[in-house]
UniProtKB/Swiss-Prot annotation:
Major site of localization recorded for this protein: membrane
Biological source species: Bacillus subtilis (strain 168)
GO terms for MF: ATP binding; catalytic activity
Function: Involved in sporulation.
Membrane topology: Peripheral membrane protein
SUPFAM superfamilies: Glutathione synthetase ATP-binding domain-like
GO cellular component assignments: membrane
Name of protein: Endospore coat-associated protein YheC
Gene for this chain: yheC
Length: 363
């Protein structure tokens, strides 16, 4: 029996999701375990893990060899825990006796910069600058009048700041949970001091895209894509995420509603419907394959796009470890597809290796 290891920074992270996979794993001839990078012993090359027993629906502790296949669901922050985990995961990616069912993407700047080199994808990427100096922000804001600062390593909308240049002041608006906060700077000196403090962390700078609908709710579209057994990318689901009224973003962690794509789509003008469908097709037929070629093999992607007030379609973000909540909320019928695809991927990789004469190791 082959072993698939669900790796996260905490055994409790995505517990419900891993349990759904674990329940279905025996159907695919897979033993399913959970572990963290810190559970690996560098001396023995063995891992302490929780293994799922379907007969009793329980997790039991065990020690075994590093699993044959790894499903990487590690989400990194700025904390020391994350920083300690990263080199272990990088070592695992090079370990010859295991295989990741999908690789991750590098930082946002690297991904966006590479996508800008692709002739089909380039028109969908907002102008993006890797910012390290106040002068860059001042120049960009003077030109655009409104721009967005995004953390280079952020997720879920955390740390995003809207800058607006007024006649007499500059404002910086951001979310703290559900609440929107605004700082006002009456002169360049105070704004410069604030910028230098913010830029102690890595940020990207983009023009502000107004993505509010007619009721003033920010909306974006999550395209959830997975690679099938044949290596082809499929759009498993589409959901429209709606943030707080008058908010900046639609993907605030824990704070967005999910609408069906069809109900939202019917509400936009007919001319925009045609353009949107054409652009979605172009994006889904180019972005996954290009990223796969650059950084792969990948397995799943969350493509976040928007229809801005100016009528243009933009790519807002790309995530190689996407969540499933918004898709499941609007398309519960996709549950089995979402919960079996990682197992099918693992089974496919094993089948490929078996044809080459590579057999799973004893644990």
């Amino acid at each position: 029996m082959i072993t698939l290891g669900f790796m996260s920074l905490s055994r409790q992270h995505e517990a419900d999701y891993s349990a759904e996979l674990a329940k279905r794993a025996p159907e695919f001839g897979i033993r399913f375990i959970r572990f963290t990078p810190f559970d690996i012993s560098p001396d023995t090359l063995r891992v302490k893990a929780s293994v799922y027993h379907s007969a009793s629906s329980t997790w039991n502790e065990t020690e075994m060899a590093i699993p044959d296949y790894i499903y990487d669901r590690c989400f990194y922050g700025k904390d020391s825990h994350s920083q300690k985990a990263k080199p272990i995961v990088e070592w695992l990616k090079k370990y010859p006796k295991t295989e990741f069912i999908g690789r991750g993407l590098p930082d946002k700047w690297t991904v966006l910069h590479d996508l800008q080199q692709h002739s089909v994808i380039n028109p969908y990427i907002p102008e993006t600058i890797k910012v390290s100096r106040y002068e860059q922000i001042h120049s960009f804001l003077s030109k655009e009048k409104a721009c967005i600062l995004k953390p280079a390593f952020g997720a879920g909308g955390r740390g995003v700041i809207l800058l607006k240049l007024g006649k007499k002041n500059i404002t910086a608006t951001y979310h703290i949970g559900k609440d929107k906060q605004t700082k006002t700077f009456s002169n360049q000196t105070s704004f410069k001091t604030w910028c230098k403090k913010v830029l102690q962390h890595q940020y990207l700078l983009q023009p502000y895209l107004n993505i509010q609908d007619k009721e003033q709710y920010p909306c974006d579209i999550r395209l959830f894509m997975e690679k099938n057994e044949a290596g082809e990318w499929n759009t498993v689901g589409k959901a429209v995420r709606r943030g707080y009224k008058h908010g900046l973003l639609a993907n605030l962690s824990g704070g967005s509603d999910a609408l069906t794509f069809d109900s939202w789509f019917e509400d936009i003008p007919k001319k925009q419907q045609v353009v949107l469908l054409d652009d979605v097709f172009s994006i889904t037929q180019s972005v996954p394959y290009y990223l796969d070629e650059r950084y792969g093999p990948l397995f799943e992607l969350g493509l976040d796009i928007c229809l801005a007030k100016d009528g243009r379609i933009w790519i807002l973000d790309i995530n190689s470890k996407p969540g499933r909540k918004s898709i499941l909320r609007v398309s519960p019928e996709q549950k089995e597809q979402l919960y079996t695809c990682p197992l099918k991927r693992c089974q496919y990789l094993f089948s490929e290796q078996s044809q080459k004469g590579v057999l799973p190791r004893e644990s």
